[in-house]
Amino acid sequence: MLIRSASIIRNGSLLKNIDILIEGNRISEVGRDLRPNDDEIIDARNMLAVPGLVNSHTHLAMTLLRGYADDMELIPWLQEKIWPLEARLKPSDVRAGVKLGCLELIRFGVTCYNDMYYFMDETAAATREMGIRGVLSGVLFDMRPEFINDVEPFIKKWRDDDLIKPAVGPHAVYTCSEETLLRAKDIAERYDVKIHIHLSETRDEVDTFVNQRHMSPVEYLENLGFLSERVVAAHCVWLTPRDIRILAERHVNVAHCPISNLKLASGIAPVATLIEHGVNVCLGTDGASSNNNLDIFEEMKVAAVVQKCSVGRSAILPADAVWRMATENAYKAFSLDMGIRRGALADLALINMRRPWFIPVTSMISHLVYSMSGEASYTICNGRVLMRDGVIEGEAKILDEAQRCYERLISEE
């Protein structure tokens, strides 16, 4: 496949008339006047080629619950609405929700997502069918102790797949015992996979934990020896200065989800301070049930402007830093060999620059973070075109099936 005459961003500058040659699932060459290797040629004039974006924390099947429970705080939202409905979920519902979520990710140029949920075999199969990458972990709760027995078989089944990266997903310190957390850590270390956990998301959660344990959730995990560079900790909203130092010292990756945190009134994560201390911060949307979309570009803008306002300095978290959160920082967190360069995985999106929000052509990174509206034109993952000129094959069928599943779930209330 040859992508011809695209524009790319290199060291902050816009380079035009660049060809990108793809062989198999890798980029084999980036340059000018490249010769095609087959009949597949994409005319990318007036298009910006960007590397595949990463959604670093979500619950993709919960796209099926978009708009079901709004305007509530986290714990009542979970206990009164989400968990009762989730108890009625069937594997087919999760499959439909995942495929619906994948449609949305593909439209926004996302080629990899990090997920924690139920029915992970169905999630993995649906993700693979849709053609994108998933870092997938079955959620672990003490209220469902049998779930941990599924972790190793899932890892063994999927660890050699080229799109699926199995991981271990203890839900949070308030839903997992010390034994569960240590078992999760042991499994992750033995199989060399990532750990995905919610951490210090709400003030009530942290205050309750401190009152019970006389230490913060971060200090507790540190005392257990749980924290390391394999951990991706979602949210990290309520942190002490000591917590931040611990996360930095242990090279923990943080998945920042600003819109969900704002909508659930959970708070504003100290992202600028985390970055100043050297913490690798990525970007996620959380689930569409609490966001309510999977628009990673919207997430970038909100992440930037909220930090500027909360810190009181407009220079905090500039556009290029936010862009890295959705790309390079996530590649590091999930060990992804991605980027628009020779030898990288062929994951990229083509975005039409002939749109009002990209004119005048000044800083394209600024436009992507602060101005971007709409969707990509092409999304390519692992060398396969998933969306061509705004069209995704089979989209109508996926939408109809998701609607049917939702209506059945609601009818059983």
Swiss-Prot record:
Protein name per Swiss-Prot or TrEMBL: 5'-deoxyadenosine deaminase
Note: SAH is a product of SAM methyltransferases and is known to be a feedback inhibitor of these enzymes. As a result of this inhibition, organisms have evolved efficient enzymes to metabolize SAH via different pathways. The pathway found in methanogens differs from the canonical pathway, it uses the deamination of S-adenosyl-L-homocysteine to form S-inosyl-L-homocysteine for the regeneration of SAM from S-adenosyl-L-homocysteine. 5'-deoxyadenosine is a radical SAM enzyme reaction product which strongly inhibits radical SAM enzymes.
Reaction(s) this enzyme catalyzes, per UniProt: 5'-deoxyadenosine + H2O + H(+) = 5'-deoxyinosine + NH4(+); S-adenosyl-L-homocysteine + H2O + H(+) = S-inosyl-L-homocysteine + NH4(+); S-methyl-5'-thioadenosine + H2O + H(+) = S-methyl-5'-thioinosine + NH4(+); adenosine + H2O + H(+) = inosine + NH4(+)
The protein's assembly and partners: Homotetramer.
Binding locations of Zn(2+): H57, H59, H198, D286
Necessary cofactors: Zn(2+)
Keyword check for Hydrolase: yes
Keywords: Hydrolase, Metal-binding, Zinc
Pathway, per record: Amino-acid biosynthesis; S-adenosyl-L-methionine biosynthesis
HAMAP family, alphabetized: MTA_SAH_deamin
GO annotation terms (biological process): S-adenosylmethionine biosynthetic process
Domain of life per record: Archaea
InterPro entries assigned: Amidohydro-rel (IPR006680), Deaminase_MtaD/DadD (IPR023512), Metal-dep_hydrolase_composite (IPR011059), Metal_Hydrolase (IPR032466), MTA/SAH_deaminase (IPR050287)
Cofactor: binding details: Binds 1 zinc ion per subunit.
Enzyme Commission number: 3.5.4.41, 3.5.4.31, 3.5.4.4, 3.5.4.28
A GO MF label: 5'-methylthioadenosine deaminase activity
